[in-house]
């Protein structure tokens, strides 16, 4: 009990300290980047610990995936408020109209977890790389909340997991969030890396629509290679759904191309959001 109290006290102390420093001090660029980056991971650890508890409760109530929603919202509320880094959503109503869909999203950096927190619905689940399940606390939360894990190095296993996920989507009416590029781009330009086919096979197997989601290129706000981490707001644009009803594996390439084109166009369209143009 004494250890738990000490841990909670230390957590609260760190949290209050981070809040004060971030709000009332202007730090040099490099120090600001490392400080805010550390704060992000601190908030993630706090949210993951909360997520373990939330997921246990959600699982006992018979709806374990709700643990992901509660944890994502807690992280976004905490981190966005303290760091003053927010996302605005355009066309959010599209997400709420569909009980089940594959959400195809571009992946820029580790800060995309904030975009997840801003966008997530109560029936959403993410697909994550299998190695994350072994990360203390974070992995426990992900296991308890029924995150879909995938090992991309073993194609046969990945195919089986997608088939299982498709059955689960149809049975439970859940939507799956997929970073379809497969890796972080850290791009400063409004464009995608080539999309992987897994998300499209999943959508075809489940016979649910693909909903492309374009997260504005926010390298002017957060860009680890150049140690940039500023306050600000970025835009998330939800695009029109792409139906898969009646489609088969033979249509995957066409679906991928249609999605990729729509997302690249949207990234260019929203690139200037929140940016101060030079005169």
Swiss-Prot record:
Disulfide bonds: none annotated. GO terms for cellular component: endoplasmic reticulum; endoplasmic reticulum membrane. Coiled coil: none annotated. SMART domains: PlsC. SUPFAM superfamilies: Glycerol-3-phosphate (1)-acyltransferase (SSF69593). GO terms for biological process: phosphatidic acid biosynthetic process. It is an enzyme of class 2 (transferase). Its EC number is 2.3.-.-. It comes from the Eukaryota. InterPro entries: AGP_acyltrans (IPR004552), Plipid/glycerol_acylTrfase (IPR002123). Pfam families: Acyltransferase (PF01553). Keywords: Acyltransferase, Endoplasmic reticulum, Membrane, Transferase, Transmembrane, Transmembrane helix. It is found in: Endoplasmic reticulum membrane. It is a multi-pass membrane protein. The chain crosses the membrane at residues 1-21, 38-58, 131-151. CDD domains: LPLAT_AGPAT-like (cd07989). Belongs to the 1-acyl-sn-glycerol-3-phosphate acyltransferase family. This is Uncharacterized acyltransferase C1851.02. The lineage of its organism: Eukaryota, Fungi, Dikarya, Ascomycota, Taphrinomycotina.
């Amino acid at each position: 009990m004494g250890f738990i109290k000490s841990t909670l006290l230390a957590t609260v102390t760190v949290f209050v300290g981070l809040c004060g420093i971030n709000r009332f001090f202007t730090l040099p660029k490099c120090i600001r980047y490392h400080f805010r980056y550390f704060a992000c991971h601190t908030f993630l650890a706090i949210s993951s610990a909360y997520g373990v508890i939330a997921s246990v409760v959600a699982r006992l109530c018979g709806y374990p995936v709700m643990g992901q929603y509660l944890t994502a919202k807690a992280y976004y509320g905490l981190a966005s408020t303290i760091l003053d880094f927010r996302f605005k959503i355009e066309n959010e109503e599209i997400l709420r109209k569909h009980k089940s869909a594959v959400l195809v999203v571009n992946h820029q950096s580790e800060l995309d977890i904030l975009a997840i927190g801003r966008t997530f619905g109560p029936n959403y689940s993410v697909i994550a790389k299998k190695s994350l399940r072994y990360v203390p606390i974070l992995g426990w939360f992900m296991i308890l909340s029924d995150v879909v894990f995938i090992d991309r190095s073993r194609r046969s296993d990945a195919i089986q997991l997608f088939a299982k996920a498709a059955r689960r989507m149809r049975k439970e009416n859940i939507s799956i969030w997929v970073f379809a590029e497969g890796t972080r781009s850290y791009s400063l330009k409004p464009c995608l890396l080539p999309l992987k086919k897994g998300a499209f096979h999943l959508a075809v197997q489940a016979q649910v629509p693909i909903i492309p989601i374009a997260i504005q290129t926010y390298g002017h706000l957060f860009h680890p290679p150049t140690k940039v981490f500023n306050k600000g707001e970025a835009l998330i644009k939800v695009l029109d759904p792409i139906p898969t009803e009646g489609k088969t594996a033979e249509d995957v390439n066409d679906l991928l191309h249609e999605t990729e084109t729509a997302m690249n166009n949207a990234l260019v369209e929203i690139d200037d959001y929140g940016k101060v143009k030079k005169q």
